Amino acid sequence: MKIIKKDKEEIITNFEVLQLLKHKRRIEEQVLLNEFVNNVIRYLETTPASKQTIESVKECKKSVTKLADTSGCKILTGEMLQILNIAPSSEVEVHLVIEDCEDRIDAKEVLKEIKNSLGEEAVIRDEDNL
């Protein structure tokens, strides 16, 4: 999702969308909008975003970026966004998120950093939601 500011647009994570919508006040006489917002919140609460915190998101960004820097590569904005939104739980998922992963960075290490920063509960999948 994009947030558009006066002179700048910014891409935000599912966690940030969830936080924004939860803190948004209900608008009277906007029944369809309120229903839509509630449906989005219900969906996002079934994703890893529901188990993330501001601190865990910052820590994940920091640790994965540091790992990439030590590997001599750069994690792209879209890749970081997918890491935070999906919270990969396997090396295969890391490879799907990071382009040319095998040539750029160790997927095992990325997975370890994701689990350490976001927490096991944010990474483990609920089979009912797949």
UniProtKB/Swiss-Prot annotation:
Component of the RNA polymerase III (Pol III) complex. Coiled coil: none annotated. Its main location: nucleus. GO terms for biological process: transcription by RNA polymerase III; transcription initiation at RNA polymerase III promoter. Disulfide bonds: none annotated. The keyword NADP does not apply. It comes from the Eukaryota. One of its GO terms (cellular component) is DNA polymerase III complex. Belongs to the eukaryotic RPC9 RNA polymerase subunit family. Gene3D superfamilies: 1.20.1250.40. The gene is rpc9. DNA-dependent RNA polymerase catalyzes the transcription of DNA into RNA using the four ribonucleoside triphosphates as substrates. Specific component of RNA polymerase III which synthesizes small RNAs, such as 5S rRNA and tRNAs. Keywords: DNA-directed RNA polymerase, Nucleus, Transcription. PANTHER family: CALCITONIN GENE-RELATED PEPTIDE-RECEPTOR COMPONENT PROTEIN (PTHR15561), DNA-DIRECTED RNA POLYMERASE III SUBUNIT RPC9 (PTHR15561:SF0). This is DNA-directed RNA polymerase III subunit rpc9.
